[in-house]
UniProtKB/Swiss-Prot annotation:
Gene: rpmD
Highest taxon of the lineage: Bacteria
Record protein name field: Large ribosomal subunit protein uL30
Mitochondrion recorded as keyword: no
Keywords: Ribonucleoprotein, Ribosomal protein
NCBIfam families documented for this protein: rpmD_bact
One GO molecular-function entry: structural constituent of ribosome
Gene Ontology terms: cellular component: cytosolic large ribosomal subunit
Organism annotation: Shewanella amazonensis (strain ATCC BAA-1098 / SB2B)
Length: 59
């Protein structure tokens, strides 16, 4: 079974760069406090690094 991580949106996407909004959508996040469980892959880690200031990651 692949390792998973929990990603929670902690800040609003309003007023952010369009690419950063699209990255949140790509991660499956919709609103503040929303948590998703994703596979721990390099692609997902790269998306998280792009919007690190808006999300919280739990292993």
């Amino acid at each position: 079974m692949a390792k998973t991580i929990k990603v929670t949106q902690t800040k609003s996407a309003i007023g952010r760069l369009p690419k950063h909004k699209a990255t949140l959508t790509g991660l499956g996040l919709r609103r503040i406090g929303h948590t998703v469980e994703l596979e721990d892959t390099p692609a997902v880690r790269g998306m998280i690094n792009k919007v690190y200031y808006m999300v919280k990651v739990e292993d």
